[in-house]
């Protein structure tokens, strides 16, 4: 085994603790996340976690207080911090408070699964998929000693340089499998 790919269940998915988007380890399935990641590292296994970031960061997430503070939001307000790809302050603080600490614990790369909106709400015609690939890849390029790696959907022309693409969710059938090479 070279790479362990963990889908959504690494984080809580039940209402009030998580959902499609989640940033807090599911302690029912992973009671000791650092130990789990450490074990994989000791056995030379790379790990990627699945992210569906579109719902932002809710107040029940473990890392919410630090992110809210850095975003100028009173943590007591319990206001969800929206995910806006074009918001440089948000992306910077998201990496600082949530993603980079998980990378330091042992996450090697991310499996992004953005599919909740074609365009950024603040920058006209900015493809969310294209830009999130760029943002994650650039952060890894800037802050790591290893070659950047990202698993995600193709965001359009030129985006191939940032991610290892996948076709997204697929129907389980021979016809669907026959079509996959075109991705």
Identify the function of each model-found stretch.
Residues 1-183:
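Catalytic-domain carbohydrate-binding cleft regions of carbohydrate-active enzymes
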